[in-house]
């Protein structure tokens, strides 16, 4: 997969199976639709990304309370626990040492509202139909990105901030993101290049580097394909992480975001983050 998984034709061939009929069970729903399911799935197939998902307000509040009450880890380092106070709007918390991000790692499964999403019938339906196979939970993350830090190039690359890249976590993957705080242009919105999961310059497929400069990408993709996703707390979207994407640096307000990732194998995802047990 390390080599072949980078090639668009290989990944597209894996999705030649017909869209399956999915019976995800009767788990308690946590995600809601703000648009028709067919419309969301059509946009996802075409663009590699689609919004129109949201969390219930009471679930957003519960996840926020969990985040304020639970230690997270500066720079995703388990030896650097910190707490984020509820009144902290911008900048890293005390003890974070100016870290750009703080990740909750393995402990998020103790939050019932998060754990419920892992078997959410709507998310499993969308993921299984997009992946053309029963979706397998790969990873789930909850993390802060802080404004007002002086992150160097190494940190930006490590934590995928202002650094367009694609993920290679499985032969096929689908991620769901939910903003747990309000995210506008000044709070580090997620960025995605529309259609880049299926349309890619050959040189971007043959290199061993998953990251590409914005200059290189702008020479191939038109400006209108560079999307910034903003929305209130609870706003959600589905994304094929093989498309080029990045977080952006918050300039005025911190961002708390939840990710749920599905794939097609049980291969564990490498990286400095926790995974569901």
Roles of regions detected by a PLM:
Residues 169-185, 230-231, 261-263:
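Short, conserved beta-strand element in jelly-roll/cupin
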Residues 3, 7, 14-30, 197-198, ...:
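Non-heme Fe(II)/2-oxoglutarate
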Residues 1-47, 51-161:
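Non-heme Fe(II)-dependent double-stranded beta-helix
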Residues 141-144, 166, 178-182, 194:
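Short, structured patches in soluble enzyme cores that scaffold and shape functional sites
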Residues 183-243:
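Double-stranded beta-helix
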Residues 155-173:
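Acidic, His- and aromatic-enriched active-site or binding-groove loops in soluble protein domains
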Residues 111-116, 220-225, 247:
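Active-site rim elements
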Residues 138-139, 149-157, 175, 186-195, ...:
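A short secondary-structure junction signal
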């Amino acid at each position: 997969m390390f080599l072949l998984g980078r090639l668009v034709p290989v990944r597209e061939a894996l999705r030649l199976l017909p869209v399956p009929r999915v019976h995800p069970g009767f788990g308690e729903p946590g995600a809601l639709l703000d648009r028709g399911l067919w419309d969301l799935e059509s946009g996802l197939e075409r663009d590699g990304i689609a919004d129109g998902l949201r969390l219930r307000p009471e679930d957003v509040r519960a996840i926020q309370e969990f985040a304020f009450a639970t230690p997270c880890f500066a720079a995703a380092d388990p030896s650097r626990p910190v707490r984020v106070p509820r009144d902290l709007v911008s900048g890293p918390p005390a003890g974070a040492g100016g870290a750009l991000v703080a990740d909750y790692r393995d402990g998020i499964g103790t939050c019932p509202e998060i754990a419920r999403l892992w078997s959410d019938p709507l998310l499993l339906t969308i993921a299984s139909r997009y992946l053309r196979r029963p979706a397998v939970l790969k990873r789930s993350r909850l993390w802060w990105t802080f404004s007002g830090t002086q992150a160097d190039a190494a940190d930006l690359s490590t934590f995928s901030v202002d650094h367009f890249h694609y993920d290679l976590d499985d032969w096929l993957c689908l991620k769901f993101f939910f903003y747990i705080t309000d995210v506008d242009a000044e709070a580090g919105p997620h960025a995605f290049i529309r259609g880049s999961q299926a349309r890619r310059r050959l040189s971007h497929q043959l290199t061993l580097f998953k990251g590409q400069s914005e200059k290189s990408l702008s020479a191939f993709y038109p400006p209108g394909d560079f999307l910034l996703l903003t929305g209130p707390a609870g706003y959600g979207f589905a994304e094929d992480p093989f498309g080029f994407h990045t977080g952006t640096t918050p300039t005025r307000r911190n961002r708390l975001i939840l990710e749920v990732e599905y794939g097609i194998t049980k291969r564990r995802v490498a990286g400095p983050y926790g995974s569901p047990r």
